[in-house]
Amino acid sequence: MPDILHAFPIAVIPARVFAGVTTPAGLDEWWTKRSAGKPAVGAEYELWFGPEYDWRARVTRCDPGSEFELEMTRADKDWQGTRVRFQLAPKDGGTWVEFAHTGWAAANEHYRISCCCWAMYLRILRRYLEHGESVPYEKRLDV
């Protein structure tokens, strides 16, 4: 199975990165249009990207400040059952982020598009956390 992997620094402490990838307020700044959920193993997240993209995920790993993983339970068929994981470690006064989107059935067109989109979204996450920049949802693909 192919995976999407990214590793990069963010110049803020792990607790801030964790909040950025687990809280609805954080997620809505860089990934979702609207979200709901709490960072606790077994909790459900609502991930809304528009009327045709009203997805759900279940928290499968949660260690505050260091790890968070969602398993997609209602999503596009290519995303169904995949897992999105953030592993965080302190580094040089900031955070080293290891991102993984695992469980893809095939390296198909949707996988290839998602590889590119994740790089873009993770860059938006970094700019949001480091500089407070907010990119409206409709303009995120242009970043």
What residues fall within each predicted segment?
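Short, highly charged C-terminal tails/helix-capping segments
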Residues: 127-143
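Hydrophobic/aromatic beta-strand elements that line small-molecule binding cavities or substrate pockets
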Residues: 8, 56-61, 82-90
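Glycine-centered tight beta-turn/hairpin loop motif at sheet-sheet or coil-to-beta transitions
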Residues: 1, 50-52, 77-79
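Hydrophobic ligand-binding cavity/cleft-lining segments
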Residues: 1-36
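Hydrophobic pocket/interface hotspot
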Residues: 17-21, 27, 45, 59, ...
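Intrinsic-disorder/low-complexity, polar/charged segments enriched in Ser/Thr/Lys/Arg/Asp/Glu/Gln
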Residues: 3-7, 44, 54, 67, ...
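Glycine-rich portal/gate segments that line the openings of hydrophobic small-molecule binding cavities
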Residues: 28-29, 34-74
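Beta-strand/loop substructures that line and gate deep hydrophobic ligand-binding cavities in soluble
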Residues: 74-125, 136-138
